[in-house]
């Protein structure tokens, strides 16, 4: 079985941060939201999923969960699993029928 996984920069696996390829863009996906600073001191934020639904879910999660409480986020990255819990085939906002589960942060 083929799987996608998130890893730390040193190549070690992040616990539970993986999914079988067969479910990605179907009824599940996983995404990362990461903030970092480059050598010139500029801040960058990345939001992306294993597939397009994960990337879409990342934007919705940032808008509804992270941004309203951004001053309380003291981590550089989070990994979240999205599940199409209501089975409608659409990426819903958090709290509107789909499940968003925080998997890891650092």
Predicted segments, located by residue:
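Solvent-exposed alpha-helical segments and adjacent loops
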Residues: 1-106
């Amino acid at each position: 079985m083929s799987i996608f996984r998130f890893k730390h920069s040193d190549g070690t696996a992040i616990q539970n941060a993986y999914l079988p390829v067969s479910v990605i863009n179907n009824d599940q996906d996983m995404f990362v939201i990461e903030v970092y600073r480059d050598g010139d001191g500029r801040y960058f934020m990345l939001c992306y999923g294993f597939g397009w639904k994960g990337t879409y879910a990342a934007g919705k999660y940032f808008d509804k969960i992270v941004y309203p409480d951004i001053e309380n986020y003291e981590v550089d990255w989070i990994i979240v699993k999205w599940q199409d819990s209501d089975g409608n085939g659409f990426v819903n906002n958090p709290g509107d029928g789909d499940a968003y589960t925080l998997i890891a942060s650092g």
